[in-house]
Structures are given as structure tokens and as C-alpha cells.
């Protein structure tokens, strides 16, 4: 900026200020490197000149342009750290109308409505709303760049003011609501004290849940509203990451929140647009912070379940009741969206999201960790509720029919999860293994049936069940879930349990060699394995009494230990 222009800004020459600021803002709209502004103390002088205009109410018509300039200057982290800007931050808080002062936020949304009826406030004009939004943008930059600014915002109780504005019945422009949420997100993400105050002192989760519920109650939700909802969900994720409230109080809030998130999943679950998908993504991230006992709110008893039960009883009186369900039979549905008289549309949305994520991950080679939130939620659902586990098992592990291919081959959900069992990515591997194991009711034999022993060996080793012993301490319903189809039973004897499929018959290469040659090749193999062991490449192991692999001193120990181990296993069975 030219010296003459800077002097006119300092002198507050109103006739020249608009043109000067317009030229500066246009020229530096994408500026990120401020080396030229640090010579001759230009950054600091321009900063003071702009705030001189912002402090002058007679020049309020220029405040929007000035705040655009401030937003550009707040990108310079070095200058923010080396200059004392506390007074300027207070000015921005005042312009954004989030300086709380003696503000006291009511404990509940209902009390806030009562207060608004007793003391109605004037709605800001369009010009004032633009100034507020621009000031919030500047504060977002400052909060992101400077820890001192974050602490100053907390001292000025800006959390109280933002939450009160968000929860008020007064309608605000979308831009203002969006940057309110953006500022809250940055504060709660970067300042642990902000999370605690918002959750405990201000009862913020209750206010934000109510606001989210109100947003979902609107007839139409445009793109701007979807952006606001995404930011709100991100704030709620931060707040619920480390709950500090008492377990009972937090569970009550979580139950209500889960119910609202269920409605959100149902509304945007078609995943028709990228924005819909973004909303569902943030909702799933938030669900990972909810305890499993509260996730039962994702499914509700169907409205016509009682009527259907009455009809079923009448039908059962007219005909004999079957003693055994047919192979692969599905529970009767009371409507197209229900399973065992519970509405499971939200679970269907989660599975649809998982399928789309898997397809996107394969097409774009994106990070495996993008799948971990939805898998985490599915594991919690399967563990927390019998009906949800039954539905997920029906969708992920349907009755086996074609066992000619390995479990990891194919594009079904089971195939994808089986492939993940042997990934080096630990988080995704462990989540996939746990989901499959829970859907199998932690039954080792059933897990081998659906995944093959080779794919599940890592899980078995981790849990100490390599010897296929029964898992102790499991608490699952005892209802029969025998889902073997006729096709599976016909091929069952030919299934290789290690591979998890029928192994094609082929001529053995050992048939054409003599016994002496077989013995020679066997010793050669032993020697090669011993060389690998000595080089630290492999570690031969036996399964110890705890069901975990135990390294061997020498490969020949297998000859001594295996017969005894097999004998012990027969005695157990």
C-alpha cells in the first residue's frame, strides 16, 4: 500500500477510503505471504488505521469493507504473535455482538424463550448482519492463529453470547449462523476449557440438540442450511469427545441426541448429493461418541406393530405353529421398513453409506481410516441390541449358498470385511474383525464358517482362541440362528476350513515321487524354515494353553509337541 493511501486511512478521509480499501482487498484477496508488509512496520500501521475507522461510529457504512481488510491481515500469524492486539480483539467481539458482559444464559431452552417474551430484542438489519458476519470471519482467523486470542474470547464469555444467539427464536441470516458455528467449532477444537464450559456450565449440548431438531423440522433445507448443520455436528462432536457430566445426566442428553440423529439419517439417508453425504458423515462421526446403550434410539417400535401382533395371534390360532424355521427364513415384517417389529431404516442408511464408502475407497484409493467411524457405530449397534444385531447379520452375513469362492473374493459386504482382516491398517482390520465376530455371536466355529480360519487367525491370536475354544463371558440370546442352506449342506464336507471355501480337487505332485524323495524334500523344507527362523524372518510357534502362539526354540519341536497337543484337544472335545 502506498504511503499516501495509508495517511488518508489514518486521517479517516471518508471520500477516499472506499476506493483505497476496494483496491487493497481486490489485489490481496488470496494473499498468504506477508513479507512485504513487515518492512517499515506497514502491517501494524495499516492494522491501527483500519481499527481507527472501525471504532468511529460515524463511519459505520465503511465497516464491512474495513472488516474485509482485517480478515486479510489476520492471515499473518507472525504479525499477530508479535503485536499487542487485545483492544482490537475486543472491538471485533463488540462488532460481532458476542461480548457477553453480564450476560447469563438460562439453563434450558424453555427458560430462554420465557426470557425473550419478557425482554424482546430488536432484530439486526441486513447491513448490521453483514458487519456481524464479517467480524465473525475475522475472529475465526484470529482464534485459529493465536492461543492468546482464544483465551481472550473465553474471558469475554463469547461462548455464552453465541449460544444464546443460536438458541434464540429470532431468525438470523444463514451466513451469520454459519460463522457462529465455525467460531464455536474452532474454540471447542483448540481449547479444552471451551469444551468443558460449553458442556457443563452452559448446558450447551441441550441447546444445540434443540437447535438441530428445529433445523430438521423445516420443510426445505437448502445448501446453506446444510453447511450450518455440518458445522453444528462438528461442534457437538468436539463437546461429546470427552464428556465431563455425570453418567446419568449425560445418558439422558445422549438418548435425546440419538433420537434427533435418527431423524437426520432418515431425512438425508438417500445420499443423493455430496452435501447430503457430508451431513450423514458428520452425524456418523458424532454417533461414535455416543454410548452403545443409547444407540437403541436409532430404531423405534413400528407404529403398526401392535396391530400386526394381534393379526398374527389370530392366524396362529387357526393353524398349527411351526416348530422349526425353514433354512434361511427371515423374520416376518410388519411393514417394508421394519424388521422384527422395529423400524430399521437408520441402520439401512448406515449400511448404504458403508457400501458407497467402500466403492469410493476402491475407485479413488482413499484412506482406509475414512471407513472406521461407520464400522465403529455398527459394532456398537450390534453389541447393544439383539434386534439390531439380527438385522446387521442378515445384511452382512446372509445364509451361505455359493462356497466355491474364498470369503474375501467378491463385492458383498462380507467379502470386503474379510479382505480387511488381513490389512496392515490396524484400526480398520480390528474394527472389521470385531464386527464380524459380534455378528457371529463370538462363536469361533461360526466365524470360521463365514471368513475362513486363515482370515480370522489374527483375531483368534489376539483373543487367545487359536485353539478354537469357546469364548468365555459372552452374553447373547440363546435363540437358534441355524441358517445353513441346502446348497451349503451339500458342499459342507468338501469345504476347507482354512480357506473358507470348497477347494478344487487337483492331482497331488507327491504321487509321482518315491518315499525316499518325499523324505528328502521334507528335510530340505525343515532346513529352509530353520534358516528363516535364524534370520529372524519367521518365528515358528505352537499354541499354548492360553490359546496364544508361543515361539519355538527349534522347528523340530513341532514333531514333539504336535501329537500331544492334538491328543489334548481330542480330550477337550
Curated annotation (Swiss-Prot):
<keyword id="KW-0344">Guanine-nucleotide releasing factor</keyword>
<comment type="subunit">
    <text>Interacts with GDP-bound G(i)-alpha protein G-i-alpha-65A. Does not interact with G-alpha proteins when they are in complex with subunits beta and gamma. Interacts with Frq2 in a Ca(2+)-independent manner but does not interact with Frq1.</text>
</comment>
<dbReference type="GO" id="GO:0005737">
    <property type="term" value="C:cytoplasm"/>
</dbReference>
<feature type="modified residue" description="Phosphoserine">
    <location>
        <position position="483"/>
    </location>
</feature>
<feature type="modified residue" description="Phosphoserine">
    <location>
        <position position="477"/>
    </location>
</feature>
<dbReference type="GO" id="GO:0005085">
    <property type="term" value="F:guanyl-nucleotide exchange factor activity"/>
</dbReference>
<dbReference type="InterPro" id="IPR016024">
    <property type="entry name" value="ARM-type_fold"/>
</dbReference>
<dbReference type="GO" id="GO:0001965">
    <property type="term" value="F:G-protein alpha-subunit binding"/>
</dbReference>
<comment type="function">
    <text>Chaperone that specifically binds and folds some, but not all, nascent G alpha proteins prior to G protein heterotrimer formation, promoting their stability and activity. Also acts as a guanine nucleotide exchange factor (GEF) for G alpha proteins by stimulating exchange of bound GDP for free GTP. Plays a key role in asymmetric spindle positioning, a step for asymmetric cell division that generates cell diversity during development by activating G(i) alpha protein independently of G-protein coupled receptors. Required during gastrulation and sensory organ precursor (SOP) formation.</text>
</comment>
<dbReference type="GO" id="GO:0050821">
    <property type="term" value="P:protein stabilization"/>
</dbReference>
<feature type="modified residue" description="Phosphoserine">
    <location>
        <position position="478"/>
    </location>
</feature>
<dbReference type="GO" id="GO:0005829">
    <property type="term" value="C:cytosol"/>
</dbReference>
<dbReference type="GO" id="GO:0055057">
    <property type="term" value="P:neuroblast division"/>
</dbReference>
<dbReference type="InterPro" id="IPR011989">
    <property type="entry name" value="ARM-like"/>
</dbReference>
<dbReference type="GO" id="GO:0007269">
    <property type="term" value="P:neurotransmitter secretion"/>
</dbReference>
<comment type="similarity">
    <text>Belongs to the synembryn family.</text>
</comment>
<dbReference type="GO" id="GO:0007163">
    <property type="term" value="P:establishment or maintenance of cell polarity"/>
</dbReference>
<dbReference type="GO" id="GO:0007186">
    <property type="term" value="P:G protein-coupled receptor signaling pathway"/>
</dbReference>
<dbReference type="GO" id="GO:0005938">
    <property type="term" value="C:cell cortex"/>
</dbReference>
<dbReference type="GO" id="GO:0040001">
    <property type="term" value="P:establishment of mitotic spindle localization"/>
</dbReference>
<dbReference type="GO" id="GO:0061176">
    <property type="term" value="C:type Ib terminal bouton"/>
</dbReference>
<feature type="compositionally biased region" description="Basic and acidic residues">
    <location>
        <begin position="308"/>
        <end position="324"/>
    </location>
</feature>
<dbReference type="GO" id="GO:0008356">
    <property type="term" value="P:asymmetric cell division"/>
</dbReference>
<keyword id="KW-0963">Cytoplasm</keyword>
<feature type="region of interest" description="Disordered">
    <location>
        <begin position="473"/>
        <end position="493"/>
    </location>
</feature>
<dbReference type="InterPro" id="IPR008376">
    <property type="entry name" value="Chaperone_Ric-8_A/B"/>
</dbReference>
<feature type="region of interest" description="Disordered">
    <location>
        <begin position="308"/>
        <end position="329"/>
    </location>
</feature>
<dbReference type="GO" id="GO:0061177">
    <property type="term" value="C:type Is terminal bouton"/>
</dbReference>
<keyword id="KW-0143">Chaperone</keyword>
<dbReference type="InterPro" id="IPR019318">
    <property type="entry name" value="Gua_nucleotide_exch_fac_Ric8"/>
</dbReference>
<keyword id="KW-0306">Gastrulation</keyword>
<keyword id="KW-0770">Synapse</keyword>
<keyword id="KW-0217">Developmental protein</keyword>
<dbReference type="GO" id="GO:0008104">
    <property type="term" value="P:protein localization"/>
</dbReference>
<keyword id="KW-0966">Cell projection</keyword>
<keyword id="KW-0597">Phosphoprotein</keyword>
<dbReference type="GO" id="GO:0010004">
    <property type="term" value="P:gastrulation involving germ band extension"/>
</dbReference>
<protein>
    <recommendedName>
        <fullName>Chaperone Ric-8</fullName>
    </recommendedName>
</protein>
<dbReference type="Pfam" id="PF10165">
    <property type="entry name" value="Ric8"/>
</dbReference>
<feature type="modified residue" description="Phosphoserine">
    <location>
        <position position="480"/>
    </location>
</feature>
Amino acid at each position: 500500500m502506498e504511503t499516501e493511501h495509508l495517511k488518508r486511512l489514518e486521517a479517516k478521509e471518508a471520500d477516499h477510503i472506499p476506493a483505497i480499501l476496494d483496491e487493497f482487498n481486490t489485489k490481496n484477496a488470496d494473499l498468504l505471504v506477508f513479507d512485504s508488509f513487515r518492512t517499515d512496520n506497514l502491517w501494524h500501521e495499516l492494522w491501527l488505521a483500519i481499527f481507527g475507522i472501525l471504532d468511529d461510529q460515524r463511519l459505520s457504512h465503511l465497516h464491512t469493507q474495513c472488516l474485509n481488510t482485517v480478515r486479510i491481515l489476520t492471515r499473518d500469524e507472525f504479525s499477530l504473535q508479535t503485536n499487542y492486539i487485545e483492544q482490537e480483539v475486543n472491538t471485533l467481539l463488540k462488532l460481532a455482538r458476542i461480548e457477553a458482559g453480564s450476560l447469563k444464559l438460562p439453563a434450558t431452552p424453555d427458560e430462554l424463550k420465557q426470557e425473550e417474551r419478557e425482554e424482546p430484542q430488536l432484530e439486526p438489519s441486513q447491513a448490521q448482519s453483514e458487519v456481524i458476519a464479517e467480524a465473525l470471519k475475522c475472529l475465526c482467523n484470529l482464534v485459529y492463529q493465536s492461543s492468546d486470542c482464544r483465551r481472550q474470547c473465553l474471558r469475554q464469555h463469547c461462548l455464552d453470547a453465541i449460544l444464546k444467539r443460536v438458541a434464540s427464536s429470532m431468525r438470523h441470516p444463514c451466513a451469520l449462523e454459519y460463522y457462529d458455528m465455525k467460531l464455536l467449532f474452532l474454540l471447542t477444537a483448540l481449547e479444552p476449557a471451551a469444551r468443558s464450559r460449553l458442556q457443563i456450565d452452559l448446558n450447551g449440548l441441550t441447546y444445540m440438540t434443540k437447535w438441530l431438531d428445529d433445523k430438521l423440522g423445516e420443510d426445505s433445507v437448502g445448501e446453506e442450511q446444510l453447511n450450518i448443520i455440518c458445522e453444528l455436528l462438528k461442534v457437538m462432536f468436539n463437546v461429546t469427545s470427552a464428556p465431563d457430566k455425570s453418567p446419568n445426566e449425560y445418558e439422558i442428553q445422549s438418548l435425546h441426541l440419538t433420537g434427533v440423529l435418527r431423524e437426520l439419517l432418515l431425512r438425508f439417508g438417500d445420499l443423493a448429493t455430496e452435501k447430503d453425504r457430508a451431513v450423514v458423515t458428520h452425524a456418523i462421526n458424532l454417533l461414535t461418541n455416543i454410548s452403545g446403550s443409547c444407540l437403541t434410539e436409532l430404531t423405534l417400535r413400528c407404529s403398526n406393530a401392535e396391530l400386526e401382533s394381534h393379526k398374527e395371534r389370530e392366524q396362529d390360532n387357526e393353524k398349527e405353529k411351526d416348530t422349526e424355521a425353514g433354512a434361511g427364513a427371515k423374520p416376518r415384517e410388519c411393514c417394508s421398513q421394519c424388521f422384527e417389529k422395529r423400524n430399521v431404516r437408520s441402520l439401512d442408511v448406515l449400511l448404504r453409506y458403508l457400501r458407497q464408502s467402500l466403492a469410493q475407497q476402491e475407485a479413488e484409493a482413499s484412506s482406509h481410516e475414512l471407513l472406521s467411524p461407520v464400522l465403529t457405530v455398527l459394532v456398537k449397534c450390534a453389541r447393544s441390541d439383539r434386534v439390531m444385531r439380527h438385522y446387521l447379520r442378515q445384511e452382512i452375513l446372509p445364509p451361505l449358498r455359493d462356497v466355491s469362492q474364498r470369503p474375501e473374493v467378491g463385492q458383498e459386504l462380507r467379502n470386503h470385511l474379510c479382505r480387511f482382516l488381513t490389512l496392515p491398517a490396524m484400526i480398520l482390520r480390528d474394527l472389521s474383525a470385531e464386527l464380524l465376530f459380534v455378528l457371529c455371536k463370538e462363536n469361533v466355529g461360526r466365524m470360521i464358517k463365514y471368513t475362513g480360519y486363515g482370515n480370522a487367525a489374527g483375531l483368534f491370536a489376539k483373543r487367545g482362541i487359536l485353539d478354537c475354544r469357546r469364548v468365555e463371558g459372552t452374553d447373547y440370546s440363546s435363540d437358534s440362528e441355524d441358517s445353513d442352506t441346502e446348497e451349503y449342506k451339500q458342499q459342507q464336507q468338501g469345504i476347507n476350513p482354512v480357506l473358507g471355501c470348497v477347494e478344487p480337487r487337483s492331482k497331488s505332485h507327491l504321487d509321482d515321487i518315491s518315499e525316499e524323495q518325499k523324505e528328502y524334500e521334507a528335510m530340505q523344507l525343515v532346513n529352509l524354515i530353520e534358516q528363516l527362523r535364524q534370520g529372524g524372518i519367521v518365528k515358528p510357534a505352537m499354541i499354548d494353553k492360553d490359546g496364544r502362539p508361543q515361539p519355538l526354540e527349534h522347528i523340530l519341536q513341532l514333531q514333539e509337541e504336535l501329537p500331544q497337543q492334538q491328543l489334548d484337544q481330542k480330550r477337550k472335545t
